[in-house]
Amino acid sequence: MSQSYINVIGAGLAGSEAAYQIAKRGIPVKLYEMRGVKSTPQHKTDNFAELVCSNSFRGDSLTNAVGLLKEEMRRLDSIIMRNGEAHRVPAGGAMAVDREGYSEAVTEEIHKHPLIEVIRDEITDIPGDAITVIATGPLTSDSLAAKIHELNGGDGFYFYDAAAPIVDKNTIDMNKVYLKSRYDKGEAAYLNCPMTKEEFMAFHEALTTAEEAPLNSFEKEKYFEGCMPIEVMAKRGIKTMLYGPMKPVGLEYPEDYKGPRDGEFKTPYAVVQLRQDNAAGSLYNIVGFQTHLKWGEQKRVFQMIPGLENAEFVRYGVMHRNSYMDSPNLLDQTFATRKNPNLFFAGQMTGVEGYVESAASGLVAGINAARRFNGESEVVFPQTTAIGALPHYITHTDSKHFQPMNVNFGIIKELEGPRIRDKKERYEAIATRALKDLEKFLNY
């Protein structure tokens, strides 16, 4: 390798983690960060790995998927986790940090590392054939975004404003739903939740009066330009929903349907459709239900949908400005691009959602960029681990319906043998297996 260093563009959570992982393997890094030269509407400081909104890294228990991911990252010597631990603040069962102390500590450690050169400058182009990790975040500057768009052949770098909730299939009451595609076109691909007129009217009332989450000031314009939230549709009138995402036409009841219906009508008054969200078929998203309701309100209102009364939401709907790639078509599980194995991406632009997930993607991308620099084969972590399941999901899910994803137990490879019915025990078993498999993988 004639190259004497690796470029890392962006010093957020993913970029800081990637730079550290590369440097700890004895490879020089040029870390570029435009803050200090050009500011963004979200950031308040020029520090690295700044937490823009919440100061929480979410749940810390191993019965929580993000808790498992954090533990795996600790075992992989994550700079983000280590400094987060050093600046924890009380937060019950969650891991929250003193955001300023934490980001200052990450910044100081990066600056002091003898193999990391920090360059405060805006990068407007992708460096040739040099090994590079791009981790410029959800609001990549327009100039670099255009170059990434070109790199993808005009495809795969999108702005998104919404994501619909995702539920665990095992928590859906299958006695109240039926499998069917509209007009029976193709194979039956949707789970349909039928509503009577009475059920729909109660649902509509709940939706129009539910409390929305506050928007950050820098999100407002994009919010109104983007996809229409389901609660906004509801406020525009009943017909907006009945001719939109809850359209019942072509979704007649099956002959053996025994649930409630309006008289002898063969078609429900309204239908909520659920679409398979992962290859394993363990997750389903609520089609067309992008939303900005508060999470508690989402649970209350969406559990009014027949079949979802006891549904477990592995991801709630979100509404904010973001940019992300068509990772299923563009990236390998190593976070390298398929067209150019010297070019890696990390962070939210790859379709991972959340602070911890972004840092985890930087960790994997950094390790693999370093291995490529050294002429070694890249590593793919086991799908039984959280840090292996996340890149597998974003690179193997259906590209047409791909949306950013938090880590959750639904994307981790299922346990072998009979299903453990107790959820806590099941998650504990998944976590125990994950940490054992990670240890074996690292010692292989």
From Swiss-Prot:
Q: Which residues form a coiled coil?
A: none
PROSITE patterns annotated for this entry? GIDA_2
What Pfam families does UniProt report for this protein, alphabetically?
A: GIDA
- One GO BP: tRNA wobble uridine modification
Keywords from UniProt, A to Z, are: Cytoplasm, FAD, Flavoprotein, Methyltransferase, NAD, NADP, Transferase, tRNA processing
- EC numbers listed for it are 2.1.1.74
The role this protein plays is: Catalyzes the folate-dependent formation of 5-methyl-uridine at position 54 (M-5-U54) in all tRNAs.
Q: What is this protein called?
A: Methylenetetrahydrofolate--tRNA-(uracil-5-)-methyltransferase TrmFO
Source organism per entry reads Streptococcus agalactiae serotype III (strain NEM316)
